[in-house]
């Protein structure tokens, strides 16, 4: 008879390194990363708005309030996915959507809720581009602006080896434009159940017998932790039978 710790040591010493494989990003959930993932780009890639609203120069809306709104001329509409075409000058603004690039000349965004373009009753905004707007609140420089590289900088390691890939990790990798990931192969693990008292689950119980339940528990645990279980049945309580199965 050997101790549990010695048995674990013997088993561990017999294991070989798990191979590495490349898998598509769509099949990488739950897999274990084998090497660093480094970003080649900044995220965001461009300075953009974090709110639907109006891109402004901070100095133009200084002192704006409910009783003393600032009036700005609207010179452009910038939905998400469009590149700005105008430089915003004094007392000018551009309507901008969340995620859209900031135009040249501005340094903040006023949320649409702080302008006369927001209908508080319907909690919506007009799709028509106004010629001018009223701004009811001042903002500080950088307000509602996401800067280049604010989340991830080019050259930054975003995921390290031996980490299990979660859904949010795959989303991040997709944002970096990476379609293939290097992961460890899933280890194949053989399961035997030992015991003269065991019966397969589809066989009716007899006196002194029990169903083989551990095989299903172990298979589920192995699958959950990333392995590939393979159940090879029940082995009787005989040394020769156990050795032969191994």
Feature annotation, model-predicted:
Residues 1-66, 95, 107, 126:
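Short, low-complexity N-terminal leaders and the immediately following helix N-cap/first helix
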Residues 2, 55-231, 236:
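Short, glycine/charged-enriched hinge/interface segments at domain edges or termini
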Residues 8, 29, 116, 171, ...:
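Generic structural signal for individual residues within well-ordered alpha-helical segments
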Residues 31-36, 145, 241-242:
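Short, solvent-exposed polar/charged micro-motifs at secondary-structure junctions
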Residues 235-246:
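Structural motif
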């Amino acid at each position: 008879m050997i101790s549990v710790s010695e048995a674990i040591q013997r088993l561990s010493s017999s294991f070989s390194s798990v191979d590495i494989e490349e898998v598509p990003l769509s099949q990488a959930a739950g897999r274990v990363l084998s090497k660093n993932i480094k970003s080649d780009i900044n995220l965001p890639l461009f300075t953009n708005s974090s709110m639907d609203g109006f891109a402004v120069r901070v100095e133009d809306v200084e002192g704006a309030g409910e009783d003393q709104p600032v009036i700005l001329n609207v010179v452009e509409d910038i939905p998400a996915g469009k590149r700005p075409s105008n430089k915003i000058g004094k007392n000018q603004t551009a309507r901008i959507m969340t995620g859209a690039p900031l135009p040249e000349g501005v340094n903040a965004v006023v949320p649409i809720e702080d302008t006369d373009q927001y209908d508080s009753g319907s909690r919506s905004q007009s799709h028509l581009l106004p010629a001018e707007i009223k701004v009811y609140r001042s903002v500080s420089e950088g307000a509602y602006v996401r800067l280049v590289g604010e989340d991830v900088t080019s050259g930054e390691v975003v995921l390290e080896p031996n980490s299990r890939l979660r859904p949010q990790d795959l989303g991040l990798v997709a944002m970096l434009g990476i379609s293939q990931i290097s992961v460890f192969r899933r280890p194949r693990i053989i399961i035997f159940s030992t015991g003269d008292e065991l019966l397969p689950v589809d066989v009716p119980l007899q006196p002194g017998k029990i169903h083989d339940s551990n095989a299903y528990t172990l298979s589920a645990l192995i699958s959950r932790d990333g392995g590939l279980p393979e159940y090879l049945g029940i082995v009787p309580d005989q040394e020769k039978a156990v050795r032969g199965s191994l």
